[in-house]
Regions:
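Fe(II)/2-oxoglutarate oxygenase catalytic core
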Residues: 1-121, 127-178
Length: 178
């Protein structure tokens, strides 16, 4: 059900991933057959999950961690669902930096808490709602979802390309709080 893999990347791969400069506030699309351009793309392709490609995003510091579901977050914009008919199977989280205290991944459906540890890859069924426990310090993770069918909101994404998109859930959250 939940998979945890510690020391997922080699020391060299981890160093490369933590030293690249990317747009952290964007969703990164990496097509399954694309040529990796950096360590983030290599991380995504190393997971080897089924799908046309994957979306990945950096979680630096959630302002107000809330229980959420990644399918809804990734496929809803302006109140409209762009959910594909064939859904991903799992959510992946890769931890780059662990906080001083707290920051556990909480999955209420199965009464599970997973501690954030640097260089840890975690995956769980995508339908599970989850959130991050409050924490102190710096916590950085990368969320990754492999799509067997691309949501129509991600225009021009395909198995051969690499693109960046705005974070739909941030735009949706702003719209719902105004």
């Amino acid at each position: 059900m939940i998979s945890v893999s510690d020391d997922y990347l080699s020391e060299e791969q981890f160093k490369s991933l933590t030293s690249i400069h990317l747009e952290y506030n964007k969703v990164h699309w990496v097509g399954k057959k694309s040529n990796p351009e950096n360590a983030l793309h290599e991380l995504i392709q190393s997971i080897n999950e089924e799908g046309i490609g994957a979306t990945a995003w950096y979680n630096i510091r959630p302002i107000n961690p809330k229980l959420h579901n990644d399918i809804s977050s990734y496929t809803t914009y302006m109140g409209k669902s762009y959910k594909p008919s064939k859904l991903p199977k799992r959510t992946y989280l890769y931890y780059i930096h662990a906080p001083k205290t707290g920051g556990q991944l909480i999955i209420p459906d199965i009464d599970e808490e997973i501690k954030p540890i640097s260089n840890r890859l975690v995956s769980f069924p995508i339908q599970y709602d989850h959130k991050i426990e409050s924490y102190t310090g710096n916590r950085v993770s990368i969320g990754i979802i492999f799509w067997p069918e691309i949501p129509s909101i991600y225009k021009n994404a395909n198995e051969n390309n690499i693109l960046t998109f705005n974070r739909l859930w941030e735009e949706e959250d702003k719209r719902n709080t105004i």
